């Protein structure tokens, strides 16, 4: 039986707009097990990104609990560094560092072995079709290539959970499929869970579970 890696329990997120209370998330629950591929769809403004931010300990819910069972870390910044991987549609690469250096940066911040980090990063970048561009600067890469570097960076610390917000939005269908295959590989080989927000319904239906976020709640789609 797979171990649970994330529990969102009775999560609510409310905002005030004048005298009106906007309920973005409303008593939402989600349990994520290791190795699961989860897709979340929903209309623009439905709260998908807010949900990812709360799950990733980047935002606090108005009510409810984010539980990460069996984590040996208590401080949020350490959980984010060692336990979680983040991918956004905007890649936020460091422009003065090569593709390879961008990918190994989280591993070096963690104080882990540089040689092993380079070997792992080279393998991931090669799996994403960037084996010949390890030493290119971000400005020398296309938008899709830059996004693949960002995806590789999210994987370098072998996180328990990857939180991906429209990770393939700027990618062509072939590269989108390569990204899915990489997610599938880390899920099956490393038991990494992936929670992905996407508007790509074809990609969403390839995942193990598909949820739709509507009126602040998640429902099986």
Swiss-Prot record:
Chain ranges of the ABC transporter domain: 6-220
Subcellular compartments: Cell inner membrane
Key words, A-Z: ATP-binding, Cell inner membrane, Cell membrane, Membrane, Nucleotide-binding, Translocase, Transport
Membrane topology: Peripheral membrane protein
Binding-site residues for ATP, renumbered to this chain: 42-49
EC number(s) given by UniProt: 7.6.2.-
EC class name: translocase
Keyword Ribosomal protein on entry: no
Family matches, as Pfam families: ABC_tran
Record's GO cellular component terms: plasma membrane
An MF annotation (GO) of this entry: ATP hydrolysis activity
Gene3D superfamilies given in the database record: P-loop containing nucleotide triphosphate hydrolases
SUPFAM superfamilies the UniProt entry points to: P-loop containing nucleoside triphosphate hydrolases
Subunit structure: The complex is composed of two ATP-binding proteins (LolD) and two transmembrane proteins (LolC and LolE).
Main function: Part of the ABC transporter complex LolCDE involved in the translocation of mature outer membrane-directed lipoproteins, from the inner membrane to the periplasmic chaperone, LolA. Responsible for the formation of the LolA-lipoprotein complex in an ATP-dependent manner.
PANTHER family (UniProt xref): ABC TRANSPORTER ATP-BINDING PROTEIN MG467-RELATED, LIPOPROTEIN-RELEASING SYSTEM ATP-BINDING PROTEIN LOLD
Family to which the UniProt record says this protein belongs: Belongs to the ABC transporter superfamily. Lipoprotein translocase (TC 3.A.1.125) family.
Protein name: Lipoprotein-releasing system ATP-binding protein LolD
């Amino acid at each position: 039986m797979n171990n649970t890696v994330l529990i969102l329990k009775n999560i609510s997120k409310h905002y005030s707009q004048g005298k009106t209370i906007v309920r973005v998330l409303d008593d939402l629950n989600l349990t994520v097990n290791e190795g699961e591929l989860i897709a979340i769809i929903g209309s623009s403004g439905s709260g998908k990104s807010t949900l990812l931010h709360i799950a990733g300990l980047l935002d606090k819910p108005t009510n409810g609990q984010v539980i990460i069972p069996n984590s040996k870390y208590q401080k949020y910044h350490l959980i984010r560094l060692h336990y979680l991987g983040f991918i956004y549609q905007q890649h936020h690469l460091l422009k003065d560092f090569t593709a390879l250096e961008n990918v190994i940066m989280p591993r070096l911040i963690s104080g882990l072995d540089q040689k092993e980090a380079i070997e792992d990063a080279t393998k991931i970048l090669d799996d994403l079709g960037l084996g010949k561009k390890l030493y290119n600067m971000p400005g020398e890469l296309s938008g899709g290539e830059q996004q693949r570097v960002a995806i590789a960076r999210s994987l370098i610390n072998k996180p328990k959970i990857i939180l991906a917000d429209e990770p393939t939005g700027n990618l062509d269908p072939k590269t989108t499929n390569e990204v899915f295959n990489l997610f599938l590989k880390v899920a099956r080989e490393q038991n990494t869970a992936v929670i992905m927000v996407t508007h790509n319904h074809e990609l969403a239906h390839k995942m193990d579970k598909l949820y739709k976020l509507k009126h602040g709640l998640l429902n099986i789609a």
